């Protein structure tokens, strides 16, 4: 699996703010292509974020999120994720 982080700061995990609740949700991508595509879309949205893709064990990142009560979403090849207006790390 893959996540997005701040470039050279893997502890700065990228998250999306859910509009209705304000919850931060970490997208966890099953496929590198989907992660790359999303990162490109973010850069084209002129977010001023310098992101990098990190390959990570899915069980590890899911467990880390659950341990911290951090919401997450598994992005499969069948999902379409488009960057929202409110991007947060």
Question: Where do the language-model regions lie?
Answer:
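Conserved NAD+-utilizing ADP-ribose enzyme module
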Residues: 1-89
């Amino acid at each position: 699996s893959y996540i997005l982080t701040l470039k050279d700061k893997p502890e700065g995990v990228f998250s999306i703010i859910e509009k209705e609740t304000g919850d931060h949700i970490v997208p966890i991508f099953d496929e590198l292509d989907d992660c790359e595509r999303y990162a490109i879309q973010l850069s084209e949205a002129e977010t001023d974020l310098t992101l990098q893709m990190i390959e990570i064990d899915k069980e590890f990142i899911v467990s880390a999120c659950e341990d911290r009560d951090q919401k997450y979403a598994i992005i499969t090849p069948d999902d379409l994720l488009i960057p929202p207006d409110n991007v947060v790390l």
